[in-house]
């Protein structure tokens, strides 16, 4: 089971107050429902591939409105042959849609979220939970990027969802897709906040556990890469210095170097694996800093380059 499916399964087990049940059901019917007329009767089909969500819708309708509800199961024939669950409401459809603030009294469609429906903070959370159950997805935190989104067919409702989420300081964004619109989150901290808002506390803990391990692993990898790069840089510099010292020795001899430079040159060749700090502790006459040693080695490099260029070097 995917992380998103586990999250939704957890959400379908939550207990709610009556006002919150109405807010969640409104989102589920609005986003997953479709209307049909048969024998002059209006019916509503709410379709989902998640059995737990279908049971949730069935229970909320029975509990909230005491109506006859049918539950149908069909097999998808294309691509993945998953079951499709259809919750069919065949009575009081018009009254229920109006009560859930999906249609007006004249049966015209309400495209945004009714403020009356989400007046309380708990109902705001519940509407977002219903919207996530109906059209939401969230990436497994083990994947390369963090992403949570809620899909809506029309812009007004999508904008309402974005506004509702940002009322909780989630910094959500909207984007038009080929067949609709999405409101999405990309920041891991905001995704965990959203999971907390809708009541997916087990999913939140799992997300955070995986994220912490992943971030620690990335930090260790960055540290190792940095140390490896520094080590390679140090080794490269040491090899260059030794090559230049040997070139000077083979062409004009190390006696051409001033005493302080000659001492460092001999130490560098004799102790090729030691650090600049350790070289500074080996010189006669007192300890020299890393920058002091580095300065002398650069002078040796300059002399080697002058010799390669055919210039005459005189001992100073």
Curated annotation (Swiss-Prot):
User: GO molecular function: any one?
Assistant: DNA binding
The alphabetical list of record keywords is: Cell cycle, Cell division, DNA-binding
Query: Which biological process, per GO, is one annotated for this protein?
Result: regulation of sporulation
Pfam families linked to this entry:
HTH_WhiA, LAGLIDADG_WhiA, WhiA_N
Residue ranges forming the DNA-binding region read 275-309
Superkingdom of origin organism: Bacteria
What is this protein for, i.e. what is its function? Involved in cell division and chromosome segregation.
Family membership noted in the UniProt record: Belongs to the WhiA family.
Protein known as: Probable cell division protein WhiA
Specify the species: Bacillus cytotoxicus (strain DSM 22905 / CIP 110041 / 391-98 / NVH 391-98)
Q: Which gene encodes it?
A: whiA
